[in-house]
Swiss-Prot record:
Protein name, UniProt field: Elongation factor 4
Enzyme category, top tier: hydrolase
Residues given in the record as GTP binding sites: 19-24, 136-139
Localisation: Cell inner membrane
One Pfam family linked to the record: LepA_C
Record InterPro entries: EF-4 (IPR006297), EFG_III/V (IPR035647), EFG_V-like (IPR000640), EFTu-like_2 (IPR004161), G_TR_CS (IPR031157), GUFP (IPR027518), LepA_C_sf (IPR038363), LepA_CTD (IPR013842)
GO biological process: positive regulation of translation; translation
Entry's family note: Belongs to the TRAFAC class translation factor GTPase superfamily. Classic translation factor GTPase family. LepA subfamily.
Length: 603
């Protein structure tokens, strides 16, 4: 199965924005080449997580090997590496691009170029990939292929004279795409005689075989009898099996340069087989690793707490297991007076955070509370020490610190012209600095802003979508830290600080946020036997307060008439009891109240 000459190998990926039909196109390619029979075919064949199908997005990378008989009568092997389209998963895209020589740029013929497509196209151009523009969904009534071709030329600068129009749904144009892959994408370089180097572009955890590593061989070859060495961790393994994905795993004896395959070697955790790492042979190791891999850094942090304290060990096990297959997830134990034991977790972005939370709840049957997302702040202490703070509750007191810097991103928003005003208003509300505005076509515009990441991670995306009826798309990347007048806003419930509700806000917004928080808590916390003060404070200064009045038991109900002093005595006794209760009583804040307030942080 693997004795294909390098000249007849093609490695390519598909770049597309969410919903532009990438997974459906991949399905058609698999079907047309006979890789998957029509009987076994199910929609979004390569998206094999339930969550991926439901949300219609690709999260984990998949790969598939197809045999294709081209017009010249020769049989070619096409390796399709499926990539995620969402901005959070751009690191997954970058490593799959490194394993390819070409890419299909899929653009919806009715919607045009979107922000995340652009980000990935630039990554592909940096990797010197041959890009084939494909206009999908030409069967839709609103499709305008000529207009979209001009858009691709003006925005990306690609020649679209050979762009292929297709409809992945009906199958129109699929044979032309397969032929274009053979004709226009170059074959891999023939480096079979050099030292073995293979790039890991994905890995997942199999409970029976350990970590399954997907790799692309850049030079040399790997056979089943070899002992392999992973260059960054310096660990060596004996191979249990190697093979190709067709798209089900098929064992083979050896693979050579240019080929894409998988290996199993009883590797315990995905962290041992880091994506982007280089595989070489123990007997004939390569001198240096493949260039260009940076470890994924979490950008967004939040606390995860089980609603039931008994589930803490289950949550720990679940995170351990998830980390086996998600190398970008970072976590450490955390305790909170209000929530008990939990974990502080780091994610690539909001979508990544939602997906991890959903997978924990769905696959591991956990019930979780998630605190408000925060970013990493850079705090300069008075003694000159620099501290990185990812949990607002641990921000040092004002008298101990000199400055606080927060991460900024450069954001590009692509939207129809009509929504200019409302989008600029949104960016200004979120402390964004206007940089530039460009008209891409007569009716589409790009807005460029520099904006604090903390303002983006709450609900910027939802707001942008709702204000533009879903037509806007955005892309952002980190540009560094800037100093701002930031303060820590604490919420006190009955004079006790509620850690999960602590946030870091800009001084100008502190009053509005604090007032909103205490008002919401007042609605949600049930009345107790004593009065509960709710306060929002900056340091020792209270900036907003509300009170929950006490439940009052009618102690006079048994006194019919009688002496007033008897009534006074009973009321005095009740007041004394309430006073004692207030000093000793603990307010039990229901989980729903925390959840609702954390949602309010987004409104």
């Amino acid at each position: 199965m693997t004795n294909v000459p390098i000249s007849r190998l093609r490695n390519f990926c598909i770049i597309a924005h969410i919903d532009h039909g990438k997974s459906t196109l991949a399905d058609r390619l698999l079907q047309d080449t006979g890789t998957v029979s029509s009987r076994d075919m199910q929609e979004q064949f390569l998206d094999n997580m339930d969550l991926e199908r439901e949300r219609g997005i690709t999260i984990k990378l998949q790969a598939a090997r197809m045999n294709y008989k081209a017009d010249d009568g020769e049989e070619y092997v096409l390796n399709l590496i499926d990539t995620p389209g969402h901005v959070d998963f751009s690191y997954e895209v970058s490593r799959s691009l490194q394993a390819c020589e070409g890419a299909l740029l899929v653009v919806d013929a009715s919607q045009g170029v979107e922000a995340q497509t652009l980000a990935n196209v630039y990554l592909a151009l940096e990797n010197d990939l041959e890009i084939i523009p494909v206009l999908n969904k030409v069967d839709l009534p609103g499709a305008d292929p000529e207009k979209i071709k001009n858009e691709i030329e003006s925005i990306i600068g690609l020649d679209t004279s050979k762009a292929i129009s297709c409809s992945a749904k009906t199958g129109v144009g699929i044979p032309e795409i397969l032929q274009a892959v053979v004709d226009r994408i170059p074959s891999p370089k023939d480096n079979t005689d050099q030292a073995t180097k293979a790039l890991i572009f994905d890995s997942y955890y199999d409970p029976y075989r350990g970590v399954i590593v997907y790799f692309r061989i850049m030079s040399g070859g790997i056979s089943k009898k070899d002992k392999v060495l992973l260059m960054s961790s310096k660990k060596s393994y004996e191979l249990d099996e190697i093979g190709v994905m067709a798209p089900d795993q098929v064992k083979v004896n050896s693979l050579h340069a240019g080929e894409v395959g998988y290996l199993a070697a009883s590797i315990k955790a995905v962290a041992d087989a880091r994506v982007g790492d280089t595989i070489t042979l123990v007997d004939r190791p390569a001198q240096d690793a493949l260039p260009g891999y940076a470890e994924a850094k979490p950008m967004v942090f939040c606390g995860l707490f089980p609603t039931d304290a008994d589930q803490y060990p289950d949550l720990r096990d679940a995170l351990d297991k998830l980390q086996l297959s998600d190398a970008a997830l970072k976590y450490e134990p955390e305790t909170s007076s209000a929530m008990g034991f939990g974990f502080r977790c780091g994610f690539l972005g909001l979508l990544h955070m939602e997906i991890v939370q959903e997978r924990l709840e769905r696959e591991y049957d956990l019930d979780l509370i998630v605190t408000a997302p925060s970013v990493i702040y850079k705090v300069k202490m008075i003694d000159g020490e620099i501290r990185m703070i990812d949990n607002p509750a641990t921000l040092p007191d004002p008298q101990k610190r000199e400055t606080i810097e927060e991460p900024y991103v450069r954001m590009e928003i692509y939207a129809p012209n009509d929504y200019n005003g409302t989008l600029m208003g949104l960016c200004q509300d979120r402390r964004g600095d206007f940089i530039d505005m460009k008209y891409i076509t007569t009716d589409r515009v790009t807005l460029i802003y520099e904006i604090p990441l903390a303002e983006v991670v709450t609900d910027f995306f939802d707001q942008m979508k709702s204000r533009t009826k879903g037509y806007a798309s955005m892309e952002y990347h980190l540009i560094g830290y800037r100093e701002n007048d930031l303060v820590r806003l604490d919420v006190l419930i009955n004079s006790e600080r509620a850690d999960p509700l602590t946030t870091i806000v800009h001084k100008d917004n502190a009053y509005g946020v604090g007032k909103g928080l205490v008002e919401k808590l007042k609605e949600l916390i049930p009345k107790q036997q004593f009065k509960i003060p709710l306060q929002a404070s900056i340091g020792s200064r209270i900036i907003a307060s509300e009170g929950i009045s006490a439940l009052r038991k009618d102690v006079l109900s048994k006194c019919y008439g009688g002496d007033i002093s008897r009534k006074k005595k009973l009321l005095k006794k009740q007041a004394k009891g309430k006073k004692r209760m207030k000093s000793m009583g603990k307010v039990d804040v229901p989980q729903e109240a925390f959840m609702a307030v954390l949602k309010l942080n987004k409104d």
